[in-house]
Amino acid sequence: MKSINITGARGSLVIDDTNAHTGLINEYINVTEDTVLSVCTGVDGKGNAVNFKTLLNWDGTLTVNHNPLTVPRGYKINAITLTSGEIVVR
């Protein structure tokens, strides 16, 4: 189930399924339960494509202890796909 909660200008998106979520413009991920991401991509400040798993040398595993996961300043998350778990992107 996917739900959208509006909080501020851009709002937030709860992701708790394994569908590809694209067209995002987010800077951080709140982890609501232990999660595995198969895809986490975006752009840097110049608009160049970035794979955050590669950039951050990260296997895609998030636990509630990772709250929140932020991308470097000026970068944006634009696509996320989960293998399991639940997150809120903002």
Spans of model-derived segments:
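Extracellular/lumenal ectodomain signal focusing on beta-strand-rich modules
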Residues: 27-28, 39, 79
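Exposed regions on extracellular, virion, or secretory-pathway luminal proteins
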Residues: 20-22, 45-50, 61-63
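Solvent-exposed, flexible loop/coil segments flanking beta-strands in beta-rich domains
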Residues: 1-34
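Generic detector of intrinsically disordered, low-complexity, polar/charged segments
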Residues: 5-8, 20, 39-44, 57, ...
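N-terminal functional modules and adjacent low-complexity/disordered segments of proteins
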Residues: 1, 47-51, 72
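Short, surface-exposed beta-strand/strand-loop-strand elements in extracellular ectodomains
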Residues: 35-48, 52, 86-90
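Beta-sandwich interaction modules
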Residues: 12-17, 53-78, 84-90
